From Swiss-Prot:
Glycans are attached at N33, N73, N97. This is Ependymin-2. The gene is epd2. PANTHER family: EPENDYMIN-RELATED, MAMMALIAN EPENDYMIN-RELATED PROTEIN 1. GO terms for cellular component: extracellular region; lysosome. Keywords: Calcium, Glycoprotein, Secreted, Signal. It comes from Salmo salar. InterPro entries: Ependymin (IPR001299), Ependymin_CS (IPR018224). It is found in: Secreted. May play a role in neural plasticity. May be involved during axon regeneration. It comes from the Eukaryota. GO terms for biological process: cell-matrix adhesion. Binds calcium through the terminal sialic acids. Belongs to the ependymin family.
Length: 221
């Protein structure tokens, strides 16, 4: 399943790129602070798993995702996550009921930052290489997440290192993360402040054999 998914991704990238630029093996880059909209799609079945606004602090490695109220095709509460990658924990927040779960985060890898072990594959143009206003120059990176045995491919802009999309696949899941309406700043720093009803919450024990990471969290919504 993983091999097929990555082969399909390669074909999609080739069809989407109208001109190939010479690659000089760029150095690993770091995303800026960002505010934007993140959409998560399961490629098996085409289901939109979640879509909503996020804030990402690239310095302190903090991410807040709040699901859009437009995505109401499910009976559960709207997803609201605060992920503290440096601390290795995340909070599942229910603002409506003022409840909170605190759980371990077993991997630092996520779709809004190029993972540390990402290997550069190619630099190319999306759009037209002759009309400057109609193209975007991007890098494609690939790698794997040791903690989850998943593989990923990340599309970042050349220069700012904005992650436009991330493809992630394991033997059991295949997800596409799309990043849009990006502003390179954190507009509301208070989004990273833990709600008062979460402050005294104890860390829940992770079931044996389970790994909590950014990708699996969105797969289960």
């Amino acid at each position: 399943m993983q091999d097929f998914a990555f082969a399909a991704l390669s074909i999609w990238l080739c069809l989407g790129a109208t001109a190939l630029a010479e690659s000089h093996g760029p150095q690993h880059c770091t995303s800026p602070n960002m505010t934007g909209v993140l959409t998560v799609m399961a490629l098996t079945g085409g289901e939109i798993k979640a879509t909503g606004h996020y804030s990402y602090d690239s310095t302190d490695k903090k991410l807040r995702f709040t699901e859009s109220e437009m995505h109401l095709n499910k009976t559960e509460h709207l997803e609201d996550y605060l992920m503290l990658f440096e601390e290795g924990v995340f909070y599942d927040i229910d603002m409506k009921n003022q409840s909170c779960k605190k759980m371990s985060l077993h991997s630092h890898a996520h779709a809004l930052e190029l993972p540390a072990g990402a290997a550069h594959q190619v630099e190319l143009f999306l759009g037209s290489d002759t009309v400057q206003e109609e193209n975007i120059k991007v890098n494609i990176w690939m790698g794997s997440v040791a903690e989850t045995k998943g593989q990923y491919s990340v599309l970042t802009t050349v220069g700012e290192c904005l992650p436009l999309s991330t493809f992630y696949s394991t033997d059991s899941i295949t997800l596409l993360f799309s990043n849009s309406e990006v502003v390179t700043e954190v507009k509301a720093p208070e989004m990273f402040t833990l709600p008062s009803f979460c402050e005294a919450v104890e860390l829940e024990e992770t079931p044996k054999g389970q790994k909590n990471d950014f990708f699996n969290i969105f797969n289960t919504v």
